[in-house]
């Protein structure tokens, strides 16, 4: 799709993100997305949208962290990705993912080591993580096609309600 434009997500994209999510999951989660999109300045994250002729057809949200769980590096996380079902399997997700990787390679977090002049050493992301439900084979196939493989960590949970 040659006419797809990838750009940064803005507050004005909230309605489009909510609508795409509703098409995928069958229910509206406006408050959920409002927190993620409108309050991203509280927890900054790279976020992109794909659009055709001004219409948002997909989005991807990530964030950068590090040093958690014994990981000695800057880690890029893919928080979520969504593509309008009408445009799925047309390379939109791959375009969004590829652009997010470029952002991750440029970004990083302040790492513990410092340079000789005492300034924090900033490095780009070296590894990307995401979480996928075992019943989402479509997403697992997508991430596999993007080069992901099973990582060294295991998701644990304890139900409290």
Q: Would you name each region that the model predicts?
A:
Residues 10, 84, 88, 133:
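Residue-level recognition of the GNAT/N-acetyltransferase active site
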Residues 3-17:
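A short beta-loop-alpha structural element at the N-terminal edge
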Residues 11-12, 19-73, 79-80, 84:
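Acetyl-CoA-dependent GNAT
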Residues 83, 89-102, 106, 113, ...:
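Conserved acetyl-CoA-binding loop-helix of GNAT-fold acetyltransferases
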Residues 114-122, 128-139, 157-161:
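Conserved beta-strand-loop-alpha-helix junction that forms the acyl-donor binding cleft
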Residues 143-153:
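Conserved acetyl-CoA-binding loop of GNAT-fold acetyltransferases
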Residues 61, 67-76, 113, 118-122, ...:
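Conserved acyl-donor/pantetheine-binding loop and adjacent beta-alpha core of acyl/acetyltransferases
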Residues 45, 109, 122-125:
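Short, high-confidence coil segments that cap the C-terminus of an alpha-helix
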